[in-house]
Amino acid sequence: MDPGTLSLFQRVSTKLGWDRDGGLDDAEEKLRKSLKKTRRPALASSDSSTGPAQRLELSDSDNSSGKENRSQEEHILLTSDDEDFEKFLASKATPKSTFKQSASSAQKPREPVPVLSSESDNEFELFLNRVKTPKAKVQPQSMSSSDESLKHFIVDSMSSDDDFVTEKKPSIYKGKAKTVKTPKSVQKTKKPAPSLCNSPVFLSDSDDDCNIVIKSTWRTRHSRPPSDEHQATSKDREETEKPRVPQPTITVKSHTSRDDTCSSEEEFQSLLDRVRQNLGGRTSASPMPSAEPKPQRPCLSTPSATGRKTGSQVPVKDSPVIHTPVQQMPSSRPVLSHTEPRALPNSRVVVCKTPGCFLQSLSAPGSVYCRSFKQNKDELTSKLYQLYNTSVFDSQLPVDMSVTWNNKMRKTAGYCISGQERGTGKRYARIELSVKVCDSADRLRDTLIHEMCHAATWLINNVRDGHGPFWRLYARKAMLAHPELPMVSRCHSYDINYKFQYQCNRCKNTIGRHSKSLDTTKFVCALCTGQLVLLTPSKPRAPTPFATFVKENYGSTKQELTGQSHAEIMRKLSADFASKTRLSQS
């Protein structure tokens, strides 16, 4: 202890009289008595209820104020010299008034006697009789889960219950049954007799609560555990404790999530069986297997999405669950063999029903129009225009619309020019296609229908909306008429085939050109200012026979025609080459 603190403690002890003999002991005794007085109201309003013959012992230490879920060996000790406080606890040992109780339990005086609410149980019994879905296997599970819940819901009479009281959830804490247990049986987690229960167990009769026993821990008050995990743990607890203690005679029945799940699955299965029987009666499908009751699996899945049908013609109790194999289920889908090749997900297997349609063949590399596209592209363009005009646009476009090829378009596949004549006011449209981009039959097929949709919006609907609703309408109509067409999109994604490729020697970026017009001495890479190098140089052409003849005979002919011009020498060489060629051919 530092000198400043020591001097301060000496002054305080001198002022309060602690420096005298026995002064500190007297101060300690006063402090203990003041603490006992302040904690008695909290204990009087606690949740724990005691029996008439119960003996509570007070301890002098604060460690006895254990919180809600203590270990099994821990006891609640109170001092035995405070008999008035024991009487006060015995008169006030009832459940808290914040929880909603039934009308019968609210009218009774506060006495430490076990009170059972049977009104909600009778209503639930009537509901079970209406639904008629008793589960023989689920009821022991429900009883065991209710008994197991008594172990985990231990409410100690200490100040930690105050935060539990503030949780006001009337829809969750609806009291189903209230019993009284001795504290010893609660803390040692043994199954008590039905008439000796002192800790109230709050169950919920709503579907969302899934009959989860409300444990007095912070985690369970602020977050609800999953229903599947709770069901699995309650099942394990039931299996471990079955051989030890027999089942109690008095049970608290509640609408559990397991009952709801099983009954919902049974009703859904019976509905599915009736649908299958109806389908089997109308179609000549394979016979249904004989209805034999099969052992049911434990119902651990989530409830079915199908609504509950209480007024069904065939009760769920009398109809056995039939598991029909998938192969015998009647279906309208064609049965596919595992040996035949399966179509790719992106492939379109729909066959075009338009007469005279040849669009599918344009994607095959071996077709006539694909092999000799450059020679037959004008003929193919005319045939495609007539086919689209009749099948998609109902021959509303002009037959002689201008469709030309443009050599200057380097990246745009095509465009439609629309207008109106000045004198007559007649609307017109013409289409131009790029020679450098539409260099194959399938690209011509896809680009032409795109531009014809633009022309139709202007010539038929008198609308210029770009890629608006009218254009999308004609695009969808084209895909319905010709399913083999790809999606008619706004922009193309073609990889343009350039004749010449330039590459940067620093960042390896490539630039495409249709001609060898890029001067590498003047232009550099736009990304890193590196030097550009031509990747695909032009192939050297072999010299022609006339060039070879001129190279061999130019010197001798020039000597013969001394003083003559170059033109006269070339005329002489041309005449000699022509005479030589005629002699060789003859």
Curated annotation (Swiss-Prot):
Gene Ontology biological process terms in this record: protein-DNA covalent cross-linking repair
Stretches with biased composition (Polar residues): 94-107, 299-313
One GO cellular component term: PML body
Residue numbers spanned by region Disordered: 17-119, 176-202, 217-266, 279-318
Pfam families in the record: SprT-like, Zn_ribbon_SprT
Compositionally biased tracts (Basic residues): 176-191
Domain SprT-like: 383-482
Compositionally biased residues, Basic and acidic residues: 65-76, 225-244
Localization in the cell: Nucleus; Nucleus, PML body; Chromosome
Keywords of this entry: Chromosome, Nucleus
Membrane-crossing segments per the record: none
Mutant lacking the gene: phenotype: Progeny of mutant females display widespread morphological defects and cell death and early embryos have asynchronous mitotic divisions and tangled chromosomes.
Record-linked InterPro entries: SprT-like_domain, SprT_Zn_ribbon
Main location: nucleus
UniProt record similarity statement: Belongs to the serine-aspartate repeat-containing protein (SDr) family.
Functional description taken from the UniProt entry: May play a role in DNA-protein cross-links (DPCs) clearance, ensuring the genomic stability by protecting germ cells and early embryos from various sources of damage.
Name of the featured protein: Germ cell nuclear acidic protein
Natural source organism: Danio rerio (Zebrafish)
Taxonomic classification: Eukaryota, Metazoa, Chordata, Craniata, Vertebrata
